[in-house]
């Protein structure tokens, strides 16, 4: 997946030199030394000013500073400046979800966003090339706000582009609830044609983006999403079904019966279940291992979708419910038993604060909670107690 622009690290002097060198290769009149010196001067002034307010120079501000200097050092004609900047871009990347570390490309995206919105055709051509070698999501935002109809129409045409990065871009930039940017106010009827155009796309990075987009829309209109995914699944097309499976992931984790029905995953006839947890008491930084055993008559072709649910306690609040994907299998022969395991690492980090005390573990199969157990996180980090064989709780 493309790295969100706001999370990219600030550019160093080497990146500025790379940008200047790239421009000089296509426009020899570029004042390389003046450009670099102005950036160093402006950067020092900006850092000093922000220090008074205890703020730092983030990557977006740094890119804006460089883009401002591009405006003064390139020809005053914006279309001509855009031509120079797009000509100096790296070659299009392979159809991978990862964006190479071309940090010197970021100010070009900022230049397009800040100064090129009056030149729609030239800007769209620049964005088409930029999205194949860097992050162009922010660059197109002004066009979506100022010219939504014709910009969305151009994106719809790009949905047939041979580059998967371009096709993914078409879907990603019009997400109304994208986590990497402010909410985009676009009528849903402008967005839906993009999703339908990519319905049968076979590339994983495109499928992932379409699925995320559908899931976003489903948060405000669940019945619409479920009905549409039932239609897509019913086509029998493996690509449309792959997107539907990914789009419904959140509903599957919550045990939504209709989502399981759409994916044709049926409840199991289980005679006996047992979940073993080892150890029952664990310290910070240690691991908890869980083992599930099922007994029943499972016919060949039976599909099993396993999720592990941990209820993490929180100080004075309702425990946080975290769903972990286990495994999804289809039995290749008749069976009377099924066993699976999962390991949980009890190490806290920035997005996972752990509170000592009892933790409840549930096992969910095909949308139904079929077993549960409990383990305790000790309040003395590193201490190990009762690490021998765990106990079993039958459902």
Where are these regions (language model features)?
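Surface beta-strand/loop "capping" patches
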Residues: 260-297
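Surface-facing alpha-helical segments and adjacent helix-coil boundary elements at the starts of domains
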Residues: 1-259, 282-283, 300-303
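Short glycine/proline/serine/threonine-rich loop/turn segments at secondary-structure transition edges
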Residues: 348-358
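Short beta-strand elements
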Residues: 368-385
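Short acidic/polar inter-strand loop motif in beta-rich domains
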Residues: 348-350, 364-373
